[in-house]
Curated annotation (Swiss-Prot):
Record gene name: CANX
Pfam families (UniProt xref): Calreticulin
Provenance organism: Pongo abelii (Sumatran orangutan)
The protein, known as: Calnexin
PROSITE patterns registered for this protein in UniProt: CALRETICULIN_1 (PS00803), CALRETICULIN_2 (PS00804), CALRETICULIN_REPEAT (PS00805)
Protein topology in the membrane: Single-pass type I membrane protein
Amino acid sequence: MEGKWLLCMLLVLGTAIVEAHDGHDDDVIDIEDDLDDVIEEVEDSKPDTTAPPSSPKVTYKAPVPTGEVYFADSFDRGTLSGWILSKAKKDDTDDEIAKYDGKWEVDEMKESKLPGDKGLVLMSRAKHHAISAKLNKPFLFDTKPLIVQYEVNFQNGIECGGAYVKLLSKTPELNLDQFHDKTPYTIMFGPDKCGEDYKLHFIFRHKNPKTGIYEEKHAKRPDADLKTYFTDKKTHLYTLILNPDNSFEILVDQSVVNSGNLLNDMTPPVNPSREIEDPEDRKPEDWDERPKIPDPEAVKPDDWDEDAPAKIPDEEATKPEGWLDDEPEYVPDPDAEKPEDWDEDMDGEWEAPQIANPKCESAPGCGVWQRPMIDNPNYKGKWKPPMIDNPSYQGIWKPRKIPNPDFFEDLEPFRMTPFSAIGLELWSMTSDIFFDNFIICADRRIVDDWANDGWGLKKAADGAAEPGVVGQMIEAAEERPWLWVVYILTVALPVFLVILFCCSGKKQTSAMEYKKTDAPQPDVKEEEEEKEEEKDKGDEEEEGEEKLEEKQKSDAEEDGGTVSQEEEDRKPKAEEDEILNRSPRNRKPRRE
């Protein structure tokens, strides 16, 4: 019965899906007509005055630092005040693209959900962009941590380009209107992408204490998958934390994606090796690096035939019956005609194109039959002596180690070059990159408050504007109607099956009910009645025996305690009868 119900349900479900698919367009038209009617009724019932637009669920208020900061800008004043556009040219580049003439503007995001929230927007593509701003005061790397944080939104996605910031080193030569790619920086931090290579840079320039030369040190790549931050067109919060104990953390949206130590997790390492390979050392001419050599005592066997071919004709093969030896595999096309403009003087004698011989279609083959080629069992190839261990093997040669003349040990790489400005020096093939809410300070609490008042509001507004789970499922199904079938099979069908099995099962047999409830059944009652009869009969026999024993006892007392031989014989017989009555063999058979 359950199988029939299930089969019926599947048939009904399949019919409904087909009808829904066939009538999709008609349903859409009917729904649109109904909506038009409802809209007309509502418009007729509305007053003439236009209702004011609904206010956003999240109200924006420009963030304000809650403590001392080295730099903070939310751009909500609507101008580039405090920022300086570069007028420099990039060296070693064609004049057409050497200028830093990329456009910057302060504007809201194209799909802003927070009216009034503005940011710095990189407007142009395929151009060099450079803009910078002075800090309130230079940052000195002493006993306080450094925290850098800002927001990025790739509104159009990103093909190839960066959105990283540079913390420009404090030098007498620093001129922000000449900011370019060679301007000295202390730290570079932020996202960068080209092709399918998604990066989150953290680079600092370390000064060699012996030579005074600066060298870039790159943090290890994050283990997290960064692709979503570049492709989802949402605003993401990037945070760098450097501590005086040389530890660092990189966070995206307030979650750690990379961490480590400046001494252990940078490439190349901050401190060089104590020893290096001697550049003057040379490998001896007789140094043998061969682990295996040909056996010098091996001899080629006399029966080794190096000239035997790898393939030979199969001598056991026979020509298939019906093979057409006299028919060519291809013949001129009889329907082909010489083109009218064919010039035999210029083009030569015209020949019809070749086509497959139609006579060969019904035959196993045409033309000269040849035996197929097979592997030659006697083929051995060119003989080579076997390889043996080289008795003169000395291993792979390496130059000897010597003390590194350039060795130094800097145990406090956190004490970097002070910086006094922040800058964006970028090339991008995608426009409309949105930057917002830059902050540099030494207090994590201040940075978190700034993030909650800025990025936190964006996140809340995005969440309020996004549909719920059901809404997202409906939107996806509207774009891909086949998802309705998936929803039905994964949601409705299991629910129906649960109801079917729980509420419409078959009536159980009486025997099953008996096992569950211990209620007596007809055959069980009869069996119990038989048992009761046997029990009553046994009780009567026991009572009779007891009376007989009492009588015998009284007689024995009257006779002076003697027992006759007859009574002694009767007693074992009564015991035998009792045993036989209790034996299972004497019970009545159970009636089915």
